[in-house]
Design a protein with these regions (language model features):
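Conserved inter-motif catalytic segment of the P-loop NTP-binding fold
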Residues: 103-189, 201-202
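The Walker A/P-loop phosphate-binding site
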Residues: 10, 14, 25-135
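Residue-level recognition of specific faces of alpha-helices
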Residues: 2, 73-75, 139
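Small-residue hinge/turn detector
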Residues: 1-4, 18-19
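Hydrophobic pocket-lining residues that define ligand/cofactor binding sites across diverse proteins
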Residues: 95, 99, 162, 207
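A conditional alpha-helix N-cap/helix-loop micro-motif detector
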Residues: 53-57, 85, 148-151, 189, ...
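Substrate-engagement module of ASCE P-loop NTPases
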Residues: 191-211
């Protein structure tokens, strides 16, 4: 699946294989997965399987048409200290809730780029919901990304963890922080945007591979 969804240039960088070999691998992968055209009915059937995870706020859920959709990317942005990280902490708890309470009974993968993850805040949130904080913490897979390369690599290697740990939510907080600090000045802007674009596509690929 990863081969089918990965651009040839990225496979070449990671493996050192030639273009013809890569083309054959991608073609074989696509054939095996039956990637191509399909009917709108099948697209609709797939869309019906999308679930919503509550944010814990009725007003915010209403803005998001019922909560955060699985199988896609949502960006929260705003000024410093406006509660973005707190929402991400809450989502790591809420994703574990039963469906009837707004969750999807899954685990969370948290990629922390700024060192702002606080287990004690998770514990406070679990107490408010009368949950076992030890179990909730066990169901949050945590990784600290120290630079943009490390961050990109963690996302690329997330597929196995997603399968093993029933991951239904991936948090990257913050997604562009490292890129902003490492690629400074107009001369680096194009490269920075290209890397961010590819990073987002890697995340979207995970959504497709693990719906």
């Amino acid at each position: 699946e990863s081969i089918a969804y990965t651009p040839p240039g990225i496979i070449r960088e990671d493996s050192g294989l030639g273009e013809k070999t890569i083309a054959k691998l991608i073609k074989a992968s696509m054939k095996k997965l039956k990637i191509g055209f399909t009917s709108a009915k099948k697209v609709w059937d797939k869309r019906k399987k999308i679930q919503k995870i509550t944010t814990g706020s009725k007003e915010l859920d209403d803005l998001l048409s019922g909560g955060i959709e699985t199988g896609g990317i949502i960006e929260f942005y705003g000024e410093f200290r406006t509660g973005k990280t707190q929402i991400m902490h809450q989502m790591c708890v809420n994703v574990q809730l039963p469906v009837e309470k707004g969750g999807v009974e899954g685990s969370a993968l948290y990629i922390d780029t700024e060192g702002t993850f606080r287990p004690e805040r998770i514990i406070q949130m679990t107490e408010a919901l009368d949950l076992d904080h030890k179990q909730v913490l066990k169901n949050i897979v945590y990784g600290r990304a120290y630079n943009s390369d490390h961050q990109i690599l963690m996302v690329k290697e997330a597929s196995e963890i997603i399968k093993k740990r029933n991951i239904k939510l991936i948090v990257v907080d913050s997604l562009i922080g490292h890129f902003r600090s490492e690629y400074v000045g107009r001369g680096t802007l194009a490269n920075r945007q290209q890397l961010i674009n590819q990073h987002l596509h890697d995340l979207l690929r995970l959504c497709d591979i693990h719906p």
